[in-house]
Amino acid sequence: MDNFLNDSKLMEDCKSRQWLLSGESPAISSVMFSAGVLGNLIALALLARRWRGDTGCSAGSRTSISLFHVLVTELVLTDLLGTCLISPVVLASYSRNQTLVALAPESHACTYFAFTMTFFSLATMLMLFAMALERYLSIGYPYFYRRHLSRRGGLAVLPVIYGASLLFCSLPLLNYGEYVQYCPGTWCFIRHGRTAYLQLYATMLLLLIVAVLACNISVILNLIRMHRRSRRSRCGLSGSSLRGPGSRRRGERTSMAEETDHLILLAIMTITFAICSLPFTIFAYMDETSSLKEKWDLRALRFLSVNSIIDPWVFAILRPPVLRLMRSVLCCRTSLRTQEAQQTSCSTQSSASKQTDLCGQL
């Protein structure tokens, strides 16, 4: 009982605190801000170079920018915008030694921070879902994908996602849910326990993560089927004297390699977001009277913020040579087994075809 009263007093003190306690350091926030801005700028520079290469391509040549890369560009822009709009408020709080509640009249800085934090976290997850859905349709329904989806349509995804995130995250401004300040006074978020809005927000993130994982699993299964079909076709054609379809087979292998690269990139981003969202989900579903809740407050926010820092670095690090290396490592054992099985199968088919020819001559 005493612990509950002490936690309640601490929570109330955090909500109304005007000054930061001595010993609070902006080091972690500064490092996160610098890493986020630098990573997003590097990712944007790499994407800009790819866009410039795409505009220089002739009409008959193969373009280098796909719908997937349009969505990646929008994700990086979202992460950069979120970092630049959120982190400076925290750094201003440290520089003035004031909490967010005291930083602006009527707690406007606290409301601004909480709204932008919820908005960009949801927008990021929706962008990852759009990328996963694009991969799912590209592999599972190629005819529908080529007929109805285009790069121009991808440009409309960002305003749609921003509009949906704006509507959902504005509910506390319409008195459903409430934004409050949390310890140590340098961040604000949805109030725990007043309404079910915090749990609703966490549930939406969980559902999006599950949907992204389901799309990725479906893409993996479809890629396995494509690999098996291409293996059979190569085996069937190896015993014949026809060489015409060689360029088509090379195109199929290139397409499969690109799809695998996109899947690796998307899978790592999804796993990163799932890990970064886990502390927040635990915090959202904790009992308000739990003595552990106070320890999870700042930890949950920092984990949620780290995602926008990691995403651009994932894209910047996983360049095509690195993706090819990862693909070769992941597929090494499978490739060895496939080659052995293919050689056995092809030799069997070749001997069978020879026997058929001999029978025809007799």
From Swiss-Prot:
Disulfide bonds join 110-188. Keywords: Cell membrane, Disulfide bond, G-protein coupled receptor, Glycoprotein, Membrane, Receptor, Transducer, Transmembrane, Transmembrane helix. Residues 1-24, 93-112, 178-199, 287-299 are extracellular. Residues 235-245 have a biased composition (Low complexity). Residues 234-255 are annotated as: Disordered. It comes from the Eukaryota. It is a multi-pass membrane protein. The chain crosses the membrane at residues 25-48, 67-92, 113-133, 153-177, 200-224, 263-286, 300-323. Residues 49-66, 134-152, 225-262, 324-362 are cytoplasmic. One of its GO terms (cellular component) is plasma membrane. Glycans are attached at residue 6. Gene3D superfamilies: Rhodopsin 7-helix transmembrane proteins. Its main location: membrane. It is found in: Cell membrane. InterPro entries: GPCR_Rhodpsn, GPCR_Rhodpsn_7TM, Prostanoid_rcpt, Prostglndn_EP2_rcpt. The keyword Iron-sulfur does not apply. GO terms for molecular function: prostaglandin E receptor activity. One of its GO terms (biological process) is adenylate cyclase-activating G protein-coupled receptor signaling pathway. PANTHER family: G-PROTEIN COUPLED RECEPTOR FAMILY 1 MEMBER (PTHR11866), PROSTAGLANDIN E2 RECEPTOR EP2 SUBTYPE (PTHR11866:SF8). Receptor for prostaglandin E2 (PGE2). The activity of this receptor is mediated by G(s) proteins that stimulate adenylate cyclase. The subsequent raise in intracellular cAMP is responsible for the relaxing effect of this receptor on smooth muscle. Belongs to the G-protein coupled receptor 1 family. This is Prostaglandin E2 receptor EP2 subtype.
